[in-house]
């Protein structure tokens, strides 16, 4: 009995140890238990899916796509399948938006140098600015080109050019002349802050941003071209100033993009030609000219511009002369039929001497869909057709009567055939003789 108490003490000590070490052991056991529970639930879910997945396959095939929107079911049921293509289309649209943004990005810096003008370090501007810098000798022909293109005034540009020329005159000297083009290059890009308004007004028709880029370049080139040509005396500077207001820096922007606004300048003379053609044609025949010859002239203008007045003018005149020779009734027919009546007037000219009214009616009916009415009227008017119809009716009646007579004759034949049927009765009587013989044998 004595060893009992110490055992109890040891047991209590063990319990205390388990009590102290219990939380750590439980913390270690919890994660595997949770993993087991999750695995069991996943297995149950998979079984449930398999059970529900086997039912539609066994029952109706792809009829239960709505109740099972899983990816596996979508792979097997190719009924819908359009969702994949929609996703691909979304990706394609995203790829399409990316190049739009890439194209829009260069337009922003293209507009920035026109407003801020200081960041002249764009790739296009560097390449263009490097040429006039090291080659000051080739710059004077640029000035001559500008003088040839002089057409529009700009006072602000002239004042700024005078200031730059005076500064260059004050800094007379060999070493300073090398710095003069640099200062002019720095001041010149600041000058287009004023003329971009006029430049944009001239380039609105072209709707091209390239016309805005060469503004600082052209101004810098002209400024550099003028500064090295300025000698030490200020008198020559005044002469260059008188030449400077004539070029007017904005004209350079309009002279370079001439290749761009050519469609605009060509459209303006086309409009003038369009206006002149109907004006010249409305005098002899206003109704027909507005309908037929104008589209031909427009087509010729779009194809070949210089050949428009040569081909369109005389052709329209000859057409007018031919149409004036026609009567007023032919003109009305052309107005009703439209462009499809061009071949009809020459056809109408033939029946002028014979039957103008009937010829016009025939043309109108040929163009319309009432061609079936004329044959009906002609059939009613022709006596031959009526006679043929009457004869056909009589012949049909006779044929019907003949058929009736044939039927009656056959009926009579059937009646006569009844008498002939009685003859076999006699034969039947003769056939009864063997019956008597049989009776005799019996």
UniProtKB/Swiss-Prot annotation:
Cleavage of ectodomain (site feature) positions: 383-384
GO molecular function term, any single one: identical protein binding
SMART domains named in the record: 4.1m
Membrane protein topology class: Single-pass type I membrane protein
Transmembrane regions: 388-408
Signal peptide annotation: 1-44
Polar residues composition bias: residue spans: 289-303
Record: glycosylation sites: 78, 80, 82, 89, 107, 161-163, 170, 172, 315, 367
Compositional bias annotation for Acidic residues: 61-75
GO cellular component entries: axon; cell surface; membrane; microspike; plasma membrane; protein-containing complex
Tissue: High levels in neonatal brain, heart, and Schwann cells, barely detectable in neonatal or adult liver, or adult brain.
Keyword terms: Cell membrane, Glycoprotein, Heparan sulfate, Membrane, Phosphoprotein, Proteoglycan, Signal, Transmembrane, Transmembrane helix
Positions of modified residues (Phosphotyrosine): 409, 419, 431, 441
Domain of life: Eukaryota
Ranges per topology, Extracellular: 45-387
Processing and modification events after translation: O-glycosylated within the Thr/Ser-rich region which could interact with lectin domains on other molecules.
Compositional bias annotation for Basic and acidic residues: 433-442
GO terms under biological process: cell adhesion; cell migration; regulation of cell migration
Chain positions covered by the region annotation Disordered: 1-25, 55-85, 151-175, 180-199, 225-244, 252-327, 339-372, 419-442
InterPro entries the UniProt entry points to: Neurexin-like, Syndecan, Syndecan/Neurexin_dom, Syndecan_CS
Name of the protein described by the UniProt record: Syndecan-3
GN (gene name): Sdc3
């Amino acid at each position: 009995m004595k060893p009992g108490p110490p055992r109890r003490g040891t047991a209590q000590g063990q319990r205390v140890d388990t009590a102290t070490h219990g939380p750590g052991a439980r913390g270690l056991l919890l994660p595997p238990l949770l993993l087991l529970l999750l695995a069991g639930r996943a297995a149950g879910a998979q079984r449930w899916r398999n059970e529900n997945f086997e039912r539609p396959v066994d029952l109706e095939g792809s009829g239960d796509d709505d109740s099972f929107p899983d990816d596996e079911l979508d792979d097997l049921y190719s009924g819908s399948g359009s969702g994949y293509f929609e996703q691909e289309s979304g990706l394609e649209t995203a790829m399409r938006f990316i190049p739009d943004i890439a194209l829009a990005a260069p337009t922003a810096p293209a507009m920035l140098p026109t407003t801020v003008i200081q960041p002249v370090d764009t790739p296009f501007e560097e390449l263009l600015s490097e040429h006039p810098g090291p080659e000051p000798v080739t710059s004077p022909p640029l000035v001559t080109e500008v003088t040839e293109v002089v057409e529009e005034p700009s006072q602000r540009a002239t004042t700024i050019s005078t200031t730059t020329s005076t500064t260059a005159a004050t800094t007379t000297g060999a070493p300073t002349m090398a710095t003069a083009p640099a200062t002019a290059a720095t001041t010149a890009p600041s000058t287009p802050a004023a003329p971009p308004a006029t430049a944009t007004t001239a380039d609105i028709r072209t709707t091209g941003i390239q016309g805005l880029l060469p503004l600082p370049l052209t101004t810098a080139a002209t400024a550099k071209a003028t500064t090295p040509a300025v000698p030490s005396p200020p008198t020559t500077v005044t002469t260059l100033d008188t030449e400077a207001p004539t070029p007017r820096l904005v004209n350079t922007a309009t002279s370079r993009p001439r290749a761009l606004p050519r469609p605009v300048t060509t459209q303006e003379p086309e409009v003038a030609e369009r206006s002149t053609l109907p004006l010249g044609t409305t005098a002899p025949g206003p109704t027909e000219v507005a309908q037929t010859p104008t589209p031909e002239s427009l087509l010729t203008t779009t194809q070949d511009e210089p050949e428009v007045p040569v081909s369109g003018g005389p052709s329209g005149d000859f057409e007018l002369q031919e149409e004036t020779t026609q009567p007023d009734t032919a003109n009305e027919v052309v107005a009703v039929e439209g462009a499809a009546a061009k071949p009809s007037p020459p056809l109408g000219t033939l029946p002028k001497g014979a039957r103008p009214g009937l010829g016009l009616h025939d043309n109108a009916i040929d163009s319309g869909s009432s061609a079936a009415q004329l044959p009906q009227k002609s059939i009613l008017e022709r006596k031959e057709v009526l006679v043929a119809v009457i004869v056909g009716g009589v012949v049909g009646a006779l044929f019907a009567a003949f058929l009736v007579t044939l039927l009656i004759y056959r009926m009579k034949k059937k009646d006569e055939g009844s008498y002939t049927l009685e003859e076999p009765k006699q034969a039947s009587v003769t056939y009864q003789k063997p019956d008597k013989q049989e009776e005799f044998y019996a």
